[in-house]
Amino acid sequence: MLQACKMEGFPLVPPPSEDLVPYDTDLYQRQTHEYYPYLSSDGESHSDHYWDFHPHHVHSEFESFAENHFTELQSVQPPQLQQLYRHMELEQMHVLDTPMAPTHASLGHQVSYLPRMCLLYPSLSPAQPSSDEEEGERQSPPLEVSDGEADGLEPGPGLLHGETGSKKKIRLYQFLLDLLRSGDMKDSIWWVDKDKGTFQFSSKHKEALAHRWGIQKGNRKKMTYQKMARALRNYGKTGEVKKVKKKLTYQFSGEVLGRGALVVRRHPPH
């Protein structure tokens, strides 16, 4: 039989050994009752620990009420409590939202004043010129003639200081001196005393000469004799030209005459 089991492939379980300790069920039951007396099925020995409940016993105070007056607690709905909790939550939300209203109002009040603050800044427009002469000089191109520039440079051969397109910076007194020595526009300006440097403008053609000076300067606005005479009076402070008592008459200084004579000797007219 043993060989047959080995051949069929089943494991062979040896018989129990004699060294094993036999299981004593009585000992286990006895220890359980000693250490855990309440696990015992003997209910009579512990009858004094129980409380007898009689389901038909009713307190004397409730004997006068009918049975239909008593209801189970599970069927009772607390709608009043739910409404109370909801009312408390709404009050809390109202308390939290109330302080925010003045904040939004104050912000809108501040923003509304921003455009008015911008209007307080003064405009950055340029100052008005003191005269039309100065305005014309400021608007003229940088290479064009201006009466406020330094002493004019000597012109090249064949070119006069007063010619248009020469691109030589020239002052007004030099422009007039070149016209007098060249004889150009003799109907508008002429010598009263060449040796003394006294000259006079024509009352009829003075505006034509002023217009040519405006073209020489490159002014956008029309040059007038009044503006040109204002520039000549300013030369009285520096000494190049002074006003003579005679009407429309002026006089060059000796320095300007000597400088002009030197220019003529270097570049004689062709």
Swiss-Prot record:
Phosphoserine, modified sites: 140, 146
This protein's UniProt keywords: Activator, Developmental protein, DNA-binding, Nucleus, Phosphoprotein, RNA-binding, Transcription, Transcription regulation
Ranges of Low complexity composition bias in the record: 153-162
Gene Ontology MF, one: sequence-specific DNA binding
PROSITE patterns reported in the protein's UniProt record: ETS_DOMAIN_1, ETS_DOMAIN_2, ETS_DOMAIN_3
Pfam families per UniProt: Ets (PF00178)
Free-text activity regulation comment from the record: Transcriptional activity at macrophage-specific genes is inhibited by interaction with GFI1, which results in the inhibition of SPI1-induced macrophage differentiation of myeloid progenitor cells, but not that of the granulocyte lineage.
Phosphoprotein recorded as keyword: yes
Assembly description: Binds DNA as a monomer. Can form homomers. Directly interacts with CEBPD/NF-IL6-beta; this interaction does not affect DNA-binding properties of each partner. Interacts with NONO/p54(nrb). Interacts with RUNX1/AML1. Interacts with GFI1; the interaction represses SPI1 transcriptional activity, hence blocks SPI1-induced macrophage differentiation of myeloid progenitor cells. Interacts with CEBPE. Interacts with IRF4/Pip and IRF8. Interacts with JUN. Interacts with RB1. Interacts with TBP.
Protein name, per record: Transcription factor PU.1
Organism: Sus scrofa
Lineage, uppermost ranks: Eukaryota, Metazoa, Chordata, Craniata, Vertebrata
